[in-house]
Regions:
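Ca2+-coordinating acidic residues in Ca2+-binding motifs
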Residues: 9, 43, 143
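Cytosolic ends of transmembrane helices, especially the final helix of ABC transmembrane type-1 domains
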Residues: 13, 19-49
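A hydrophobic transmembrane-helix motif
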Residues: 1-19, 71
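ABC-type nucleotide-binding domain
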Residues: 57, 64-321
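An intracellular "coupling" helix at the cytosolic face of ABC transporter transmembrane type-1 domains
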Residues: 1, 29, 33-36, 52-53, ...
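Flexible, glycine-biased helix-capping/connector loops in cytosolic signal-transduction modules
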Residues: 50-53, 195
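Conserved E/DxxT/N motif and adjacent residues on the DHp alpha2 helix
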Residues: 46, 53, 167
Length: 321
């Protein structure tokens, strides 16, 4: 009969109407989210429009296959923008080619500030820093940054493939990525992944992606630093999320992992500093001691011995019942 509506047609219309209402509701939620995020975009663009006061030089860095780069701090002091307090004071310090330098100290002692200045995320308030005798400000900024592979404590991984996370690029050398992952202790995990380095991390964009632990994330970040193959490697608490066995493995293979690179190693665990050539001890924004583990431990009034003793007491087996 003309104008009649069968049961099947009615159900189709009802389903379509319900889908339409759901879609309108979702559209409303998206519109609300966009409206709420506009204020954050405004702040973001305000940040991008801030003028930079850093001087960008034009001298290209020397491309040396032997990795012979020396960096030296010359009476460097630094205050963060908007602060009257010096985070670092009168730092004079030289890093030699191929040296492994551990940087230790309590929170707020100036360790991370020193690293930020080393990588030229900031410029010194006073004093200057040289690379092979030339003020780092005179070098091309991009060339200078290319000399450093850095793993900060607050590193981030992305919901891309494992290979893209290690190489920081869409196109990468799969074999080299695998080698770096094996060096960082991810070899067994990599072997278990169904798609190898093409396996997605997390499930945000790929339902077949894998969830990783904090320790695995730290190993991937270390592999990322190795893949860049820069002459300077900066590691800020690189084993903080690892279990004791994995951490011991990293220490045992440290020289094999970093090769002939110059390494700056920041750690609160003083036991991890023993494999380094030299230890720099910071306290209240100043470099107060430098030397080997044995040399610093022999200084009974030194800050390093104080820190070492404070940590060692928790690892000493007591005979008390």
């Amino acid at each position: 009969m003309i104008g009649s509506l069968g049961v099947g047609d009615f159900l189709k219309c009802a389903t379509a109407g319900n889908d339409l209402l759901n879609s309108l509701g979702a559209t409303g939620s998206i519109a609300t989210g966009l409206h709420n995020n506009v204020k954050y975009l405004d702040k973001f663009f305000e940040y991008l429009d801030l003028p930079t006061e850093m001087y960008y030089g034009t001298i290209p860095t020397e491309k040396r296959s032997d990795g012979k780069y020396d960096i030296e701090f010359h009476d460097v002091s630094f205050r963060y923008p908007g602060s009257d307090v010096y985070a670092l004071r009168h730092l004079s310090f030289k890093m030699k080619v191929g040296e492994r330098v551990a940087v230790v100290g309590m929170n707020g002692s100036g360790k991370t500030t020193m690293i930020k200045l080393l990588c030229r995320l900031y410029d010194p308030t006073e004093g200057y820093i040289t690379l092979n005798g030339i003020d780092v400000k005179k070098y091309d900024y991009g060339d200078l940054l290319a000399l450093f592979s850095v793993v900060f404590q607050d590193f981030r991984l992305f919901s891309f493939s494992l290979g893209e996370n290690v190489s920081s690029n869409v196109e990468y050398d799969e074999e080299r990525v695998a080698q770096c992952l094996k060096k960082s202790g991810m070899g067994e995990t990599l072997a278990r992944l169904p798609e190898g380095t093409k396996t997605a991390i997390y499930k945000d964009f790929d339902e077949n992606g894998v969830e990783i632990s904090g320790g695995e994330a730290q190993k991937i970040a270390l592999a990322r630093a190795l893949y860049k193959d820069a002459p300077f490697v900066v590691l800020d608490e690189p084993t903080a999320a690892l279990d004791p066995i994995a951490e011991a493995d990293i220490y045992a293979r440290f020289n094999e992992i970093v090769g002939d690179r110059t390494v700056v190693y920041i750690s609160h665990r003083l036991s991890s500093c023993r494999f380094c050539d030299r230890i720099a001890v910071f306290h209240e924004g100043e470099l107060v001691q430098t030397g080997t583990h044995d040399e610093l431990l022999a200084d009974e009034g030194g800050k390093y011995r104080e820190l070492w003793t404070a940590q060692a007491q928790y690892y000493t087996i007591s005979n008390e019942q």
